[in-house]
Amino acid sequence: MNFLSFKTTKHYHIFRYVNIRNDYRLLMIMIIGTVATGLVPAITSILTGRVFDLLSVFVANGSHQGLYSQLVQRSMAVMALGAASVPVMWLSLTSWMHIGERQGFRIRSQILEAYLEEKPMEWYDNNEKLLGDFTQINRCVEELRSSSAEASAITFQNLVAICALLGTSFYYSWSLTLIILCSSPIITFFAVVFSRMIHVYSEKENSETSKAAQLLTWSMNAAQLVRLYCTQRLERKKFKEIILNCNTFFIKSCFFVAANAGILRFLTLTMFVQGFWFGSAMIKKGKLNINDVITCFHSCIMLGSTLNNTLHQIVVLQKGGVAMEKIMTLLKDGSKRNPLNKTVAHQFPLDYATSDLTFANVSFSYPSRPSEAVLKNVSLNFSAGQFTFIVGKSGSGKSTLSNLLLRFYDGYNGSISINGHNIQTIDQKLLIENITVVEQRCTLFNDTLRKNILLGSTDSVRNADCSTNENRHLIKDACQMALLDRFILDLPDGLETLIGTGGVTLSGGQQQRVAIARAFIRDTPILFLDEAVSALDIVHRNLLMKAIRHWRKGKTTIILTHELSQIESDDYLYLMKEGEVVESGTQSELLADPTTTFSTWYHLQNDYSDAKTIVDTETEEKSIHTVESFNSQLETPKLGSCLSNLGYDETDQLSFYEAIYQKRSNVRTRRVKVEEENIGYALKQQKNTESSTGPQLLSIIQIIKRMIKSIRYKKILILGLLCSLIAGATNPVFSYTFSFLLEGIVPSTDGKTGSSHYLAKWSLLVLGVAAADGIFNFAKGFLLDCCSEYWVMDLRNEVMEKLTRKNMDWFSGENNKASEISALVLNDLRDLRSLVSEFLSAMTSFVTVSTIGLIWALVSGWKLSLVCISMFPLIIIFSAIYGGILQKCETDYKTSVAQLENCLYQIVTNIKTIKCLQAEFHFQLTYHDLKIKMQQIASKRAIATGFGISMTNMIVMCIQAIIYYYGLKLVMIHEYTSKEMFTTFTLLLFTIMSCTSLVSQIPDISRGQRAASWIYRILDEKHNTLEVENNNARTVGIAGHTYHGKEKKPIVSIQNLTFAYPSAPTAFVYKNMNFDMFCGQTLGIIGESGTGKSTLVLLLTKLYNCEVGKIKIDGTDVNDWNLTSLRKEISVVEQKPLLFNGTIRDNLTYGLQDEILEIEMYDALKYVGIHDFVISSPQGLDTRIDTTLLSGGQAQRLCIARALLRKSKILILDECTSALDSVSSSIINEIVKKGPPALLTMVITHSEQMMRSCNSIAVLKDGKVVERGNFDTLYNNRGELFQIVSNQSS
């Protein structure tokens, strides 16, 4: 057979990443060990022939005199060979696995480098299946590793063995060997044809799996949106359709795999028939003796067995080839090594601090949208050491400026220069070292808060000992400047608190403050702030802007903003519109001309009532004093007393840094105030009930029981197992008929061999048994593969169904990362297929063969059988020890793989932030540390696997040697005839082979065992992790006409509400809160950070349960509402807009149950002021959205339009204007002012303009409503609302 054809695909072979220079020692050991191991079967054949040659001597002499000693020596030679093969085979397999691991790590490093260094930003923009391909590529790495390790080891050992066996067979009789192997061309033909079909369908299955991974990852990342829009069924339906395609392609692949196996078994078993005829004739003619014939037959039998064993490995090699093709496509697709340094002329540092920054006639279109000009002949000049503002509508091209400045995109017209030097001639690393960009959509990583803050620093600071005074002061200054100090003091572990999954989830405002702290530590000459404080409340926003002005005095600072009040009179600004600069000048100059667009926008945003002119002088003075005393100690009532109130000042023995760095176990638990600008973002300290290593592994018996209980086609499973039983039974039957053929060529005492009639009869029987064997092996392989695939498909769908029913708190669990669950469901579950298709089959065959074979052997020759049976406890004990060791190794290995892939997932999903912060080295270091840990575990696994396989082989050869010795001895003492000996011997040999094939399944079983345990962990988790549905719940919607009468009744009523998050049960968000909301209200929910504004949305939509007190909607307790019916009545627009990579139409109609007219979509788009953007897009509503390139304002307005199209009775806007420009904000403000098409509109906001648009205000503080009324009244009362709006702190 052409083995190499199975290890190549196109130009990429699976050993592409073997480095001969570095691996030559390992390769030498591997080659020597492989050759030596491959020679073992041939040597065994020779030794076996020598053993049975004593039989012909005994028959010829009629006496056993002098034969015992030779029998002992020749039998023990087989045993000695088995013992000698242990270290050789162990070294060989271990070295092969090490080669595979080295290849795997090199490929992972190449993938890391490709993601971090080589892929341009346009590649990320164009890749719609980024996360799906990410999941798939991780599986490909593992398949390639497996194919170049265990599979290649076995294949090449078998290849050596085949060559050696052929050589041995040819040596003893070339003519007999050629006769036996005359059917090999047919075998090769079928193998090649079927392998090509397997390759085709494997590729198709991988492609569909990638789509499924993309969908699953998105649905987990957008879990809140999926629940609010009641699209769980839609997501499950889409997932089910993709998984069904995976199922179809895999089953077609299985058909060809099973057909190949069945035909190969039939042909290899039947190729001996012609050999027996020829061998018998040669013996009769005296041209061959029995030793020659037995040696040839044994060699060819082992050759056929070797080919059968290689078949499964060839399939693995094919998958490895497909995997390599996929990996190389990823590495080569769009990759440009150092793409932005092609014309580097100046790699010396410029004096950025005194350099002007200039955009000259710059025009640009994103590569993914070449027909849409984002910038049109833009010319800008940013003076060194000055503050410059850029304002403009959402989508006007403001954010694109920073992308071009940092050279994330190339191919623009015009020039960008620093101090006259074109940035194309400046090393990109130098640019990023001297320019910091803080994005509106800032990113935090799943790490400690300290590491997140230091991520913006130089490598020396980031990795330095944080106990040094210099770094302590650096952290302290950054936290104080970014207004983080009080928040950090309230965290459970201070700066060492884990952020993200498994730890604390920060709100949008807190994330932005961490991003500002990063920028402070970097302190680069040029700072680019892109809506960097938009998510903050008024108090923190204004304080932070003043702090930024103090910090950046004399440094080049460019601020992109929609908040025009941040611009001072002498600040220079540019106003952009539709990619062009339409106005420029200082604020005072532009305001002096009432015809300017800026003047119109400014007055539009600042068109307040006379109450706004009421300014508390004392408040202003405090604000000024705050900035002036920034470097010493913050003195505002909000922050200045933070340290002193807690007993920390400069004279304390416990410094501020120590207070926030260490967990304050001596401080009594108190309420943690958390900003809640985003729905569902609250402080949630995860309390894991499981260790980080995951759930306890289920036993094989438990998994099989659950499989049998849940498998879809039980009849097919039974039929498959029945075919497996019959296929298993054909082995001893074949052995039995085969023994008669052997008997036919052994000369009797009169020197005669079997007659032609005798050989013809048993030859036909052998052919019949071989045909039955091939048919039933095909049937059991195909049927069980189908059953296993349907089981896996059903498990995937069950998991998806469970994921869409999980409550929101579940997604913050440490073991519930989207990337990890996606890999588990789409990748690791493949390993579970082998439990049905291979383990159950092997177990059934083993039980059948053992039962039938051993009973038959006992009947045929009980003495020899009992000797063999006495060896079985050795196999059982060893299998148990080997299985236990390998199970731990496999579990640890998979866990380490998951950790490595989670690190890579963070890189892929946050690549722009990493590049902006020059954090590549940090992530490379983190990745390297995880890789070292994984290498250590992989090494242990390689040693354990090599040990297990080599010891199994030794045990088999030892048992074989004992059977040889005792069987021939029984013949020599006339207790057995040669026929009885051959019959018993072949039956026992096939039984042992079946047993060892079961042991060889242990690595696959261990992998499948882990996958099943983790999957059933998700399926079996406690009921409190699911959203609970009340069977008798209300399904009737809110009837609007019932609120038009004279009697005024609340549409929402909150009564004695007390609530704390399950993860922080002692930190009460609400304490006995009461208030009502009425039809026709546009109710503004106002409060400082941490007062529970967004938590109210979570309770109204029942994303969290209300257990103390009541929330009634339309007179019905939310706990008595049907979840879907309730959420259909409420539309929520989140602060962070969430869209998916699809058309504008698909995003607008997401979650809608009824058909909607196109004109209604356009009306909604006009309503929110984004109609022009949509109609100017290439395909209008059918234009595909690139979520990474839409501006925050554009995405937010699409989300508002989507919410309006739902026509819900209650509309909730959660900081929905934070990303909008003044014109767009005014449009939304006007909508709110006039009253959106809803019975009740709730507006959570920090914007004064939005507050004034509401006809009613509710102010929250300390878990209660402290003020109710309209804005003007509450403002003039100088109460809590006045303090929030005017920056006065209580």
Swiss-Prot record:
Changing K398A: 25% mating activity. There is a cross-link at K1022 (Glycyl lysine isopeptide (Lys-Gly) (interchain with G-Cter in ubiquitin)). Residues 47-75, 172-173, 284-296, 737-763, 860-865, 967-981 are extracellular. The chain crosses the membrane at residues 26-46, 76-96, 151-171, 174-194, 263-283, 297-317, 716-736, 764-784, 839-859, 866-886, 946-966, 982-1002. Changing G1193D: 6% mating activity. It catalyses: an [alpha-factor](in) + ATP + H2O = an [alpha-factor](out) + ADP + phosphate + H(+). Its main location: membrane. The keyword Repeat applies. Residues 1-25, 97-150, 195-262, 318-715, 785-838, 887-945, 1003-1290 are cytoplasmic. Glycans are attached at N61. ATP 1 binds at G392, K393, S394, G395, S396, G397, K398, S399. Its EC number is 7.4.2.7. One of its GO terms (cellular component) is mating projection tip. Belongs to the ABC transporter superfamily. Alpha-factor sex pheromone exporter (TC 3.A.1.206) family. This is Alpha-factor-transporting ATPase. It comes from Saccharomyces cerevisiae (strain ATCC 204508 / S288c).
